[in-house]
Amino acid sequence: ADALGIAAASLTKDSMCANCHGTKAKRDGVVSVISGVSCESCHGPAQDWLKPHGEYFEGMAFKTLDQLRTDREKETDEHRAARLKAVSKAGLIRPKQIHTLARNCLDCHLIDNEKLVAAGHKTASAFELVSWTGGEVRHNFFMNKDDNAAAPSLWMKVENRTAAQRDRIKLAVGTLTQIEMALDRRAKATSPAYIPQIGGVVAAANGKLAQIS
């Protein structure tokens, strides 16, 4: 921030740093940081989807998590399909949208701001989709509040698929997405400080893909 002349007072407002290190909201026409990295950082701004994404039938009223689990059992296939389509349209990045989720992660973990990198910021985190979404960020408590499941409940309970299947998909899609975005950034790069670093990201991701295949 100092190297780019970003004032300390702006760090909790509408600064580029807060794009990744915080969650912004507009209140009374003023943009400010309301929290650190949050649900919305991964799943997208929640204003339009937060309520409907947990409504399993018309007229449903949220009471407790136990009641929510019971209510989800009553949801019809038709309602579920319509609900998931609607919340995706409203901006929710769902766990099943692995490519979109990976791109959203890499928007912060693979820097495209060449001035920021030239000022000393790292081009990339040691990001890997499987491990980074399976660590402290994992939050699959819907079916059991005491058991952080290895994969989302819809994936395992409704689609009858396993956590291992999901991890294999995440490994391949995450690596391909890293190559996709790094190549795009390399094609647009002009900074002598940025070009070799983003080129290194491409090479590393390509090597990982070769190991996978």
PLM ranges: what are they?
Residues A1-L4, K26-V37, S41, P45-S213:
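Primarily the internal scaffold of c-type cytochrome electron-transfer domains
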Residues D2-V30:
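Mid-chain, structured segments of secreted extracytoplasmic proteins
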